[in-house]
Amino acid sequence: MIGNWNYGTGRRKSAVARVFIKAGKGDIVVNGKPISDYFSRETSLMIVRQPLELTNHAQTFDIKVNVSGGGETGQAGAVRHGITRALIDYDATLKPALSKAGFVTRDAREVERKKVGLHKARRAKQFSKR
C-alpha cells in the first residue's frame, strides 16, 4: 500500500488498528468486510465515522482498516483513533478541530489486573461482622 495512501495507527484498550486512507467515494472496509457487516452495533459505526463527519470528509475518502485484538468497542475506538491520525497525515490543518473534539488523544485506560485473594481487580469477599 504505497503511493497516494495516508496511514494512521490507532489503539484502544487491547485493540490495534492500521488505517489507510486515499481519495475516493466513502467506502470503509474493515478486515476485508464492509464496515456495516463488520461492526454489528450502531454505536460502533457512529464512533468510527465521528472524525470523518467532524471534518466533512465522510464521502471524500476510501478507507482500508486492519484491526486486531480486543472487543467491538475497543476496536471501534482504535479505528477512530487511526482514522484521526491518517486524516492529520493527509492534512495537518485538521488537527486543531480533531484535537478539540478529543479524537487525537489516545485513551490510555486499560483493564486493571486481578489481585491475589480478591474475586476481581477490586472486588473482595463479602465481609461478615458475625
Curated annotation (Swiss-Prot):
Q: Which GO terms describe its cellular component?
A: cytosolic small ribosomal subunit
Is the keyword Ribosomal protein assigned to this protein?
Answer: yes
Q: Which UniProt keywords apply?
A: Ribonucleoprotein, Ribosomal protein
Sorted alphabetically, which SUPFAM superfamilies does this protein's record hold? Ribosomal protein S5 domain 2-like (SSF54211)
**Which Pfam family is an annotated match for this chain, by its short name?**
Ribosomal_S9
Query: Out of the domains of life, which is the source?
Result: Bacteria
GO molecular-function term, one example from the UniProt record: structural constituent of ribosome
UniProt GO BP: translation
Check the record and name the PANTHER family matching this protein.
RIBOSOMAL PROTEIN S9 (PTHR21569), SMALL RIBOSOMAL SUBUNIT PROTEIN US9M (PTHR21569:SF1)
UniProt lists the family membership as follows: Belongs to the universal ribosomal protein uS9 family.
Q: What is this protein called?
A: Small ribosomal subunit protein uS9
